[in-house]
């Protein structure tokens, strides 16, 4: 799938704009502060109903404007198209529209418009809290395992019930046993989906990484959130007192993690920022390959400031891998000349100049 038209109103410093991107490579260039990243943020908002620059959406709304809106027309892999729209006002009200109908949740947007983000904060996937890596993992499982979302909702409901009981003791023993069984069953299913996904992801990640950088001894492993040699039911039964003291459940899928190690060390402690960026790129490109294998369509990649922390050879290698995905890519940079030689002649490349919040399409930079 790809975006054939994007309309943005009142997002940060962007003037109202409608533009038609290339179905393949789109390069947005301009000075720092011109609004390039805000274009990616608008697309991210359209696909995920949230910003990647702020946990709060209020700063996204342009000063003195009541709401921000983003519309997009998505060309579907199976043919035809879908119209998406999202609006957010200063009171925090969201409206999501899909083909003229109100949508129930942001998950419906994500299913139609799967997005991958690579930006200067990408190193947080390695250095940040386990929650960030769980989000990465579950994004991938969501897009390849149709049963995941329903199971995830069951898990969250059971987990809320148990945590409420731990804090307030509001359930009788019989009811609590029922919810514990549901929690354990849903946890086992989530663990199964995640384990299968990592098994598929690892060889694709390793191959992709080898085409970007040589990092001998780098390993990717999965921790499910409780002792691999014990049943979750036994772990929960043995930790009730501790869980009550903490006020929440200490073991389960909500504690899962991905572990990247270089020899005996955490990869984040050893690798340079440039190497970390390449590892994260390999992970996200590998996810894109799995999405395309599981469904008739590809991810859309948002790559903010691609040249930063990468030398020419690594920039070229990354561009070639993105190109080989045969998907739509939006890339920002200050100087588009740094990406001049990154693409094959037959690959469609659209060039957009962003200046003081205005977007102007210019000629293909290879002409």
UniProtKB/Swiss-Prot annotation:
Gene3D superfamilies: P-loop containing nucleotide triphosphate hydrolases (3.40.50.300), RecF/RecN/SMC, N-terminal domain (1.20.1050.90). One of its GO terms (cellular component) is cytoplasm. It holds the Pfam family SMC_N. One of its GO terms (biological process) is double-strand break repair. ATP binds at residues 30-37. It comes from the Bacteria. Disulfide bonds: none annotated. InterPro entries: DNA-binding_RecF, DNA-binding_RecF_CS, P-loop_NTPase, RecF/RecN/SMC_N, RecF_2. One of its GO terms (molecular function) is single-stranded DNA binding. It is found in: Cytoplasm. Its main location: cytoplasm. Keywords: ATP-binding, Cytoplasm, DNA damage, DNA repair, DNA replication, DNA-binding, Nucleotide-binding, SOS response. PROSITE patterns: RECF_1 (PS00617), RECF_2 (PS00618). Belongs to the RecF family. The RecF protein is involved in DNA metabolism; it is required for DNA replication and normal SOS inducibility. RecF binds preferentially to single-stranded, linear DNA. It also seems to bind ATP. This is DNA replication and repair protein RecF. The lineage of its organism: Bacteria, Pseudomonadati, Pseudomonadota, Gammaproteobacteria, Pseudomonadales.
